[in-house]
């Protein structure tokens, strides 16, 4: 992307880059290989299942716990599930620069409340 003149200074939404760098460094130390970019999705899914499995036996994987409006924090940032089955992510806004990507607006740490 950095070499494409039409994208120079363009903005796009993406997971926070620092978290993936940390994840990738740990992965390389452990497996002596670079992780596929989508490895964080699997990691976050398993982490969520581990978190929910620690809950009360009758309330572990219910619609209510899976659609917690506060969401969950993963390697790729904040995410939550809605009643209709869709997912929402808290993404950063990055800018394309010749030297790489710069963060224009960091990813949110929490979702805004649904109240008015």
PLM regions with names:
Residues 1-43, 56-57, 107, 111-114:
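Extracellular/periplasmic periplasmic-binding protein-like sensory domains
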Residues 31-103, 115-116:
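Segments of small-molecule ligand-sensing domains
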């Amino acid at each position: 992307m950095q070499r494409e003149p039409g994208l120079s200074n363009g903005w796009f939404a993406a997971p926070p880059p620092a978290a993936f760098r940390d994840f990738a460094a740990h992965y390389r130390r452990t497996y002596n290989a670079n992780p596929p970019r989508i490895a964080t999705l699997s990691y976050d899914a398993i982490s969520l299942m581990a978190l929910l499995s620690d809950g009360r036996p009758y309330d572990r994987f219910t619609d209510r716990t899976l659609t917690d409006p506060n969401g969950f924090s993963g390697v790729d940032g904040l995410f939550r599930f809605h009643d209709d089955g869709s997912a929402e992510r808290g993404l950063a806004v990055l800018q394309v620069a010749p030297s790489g990507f710069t963060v224009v607006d960091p990813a949110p740490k929490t979702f805004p409340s649904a109240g008015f």
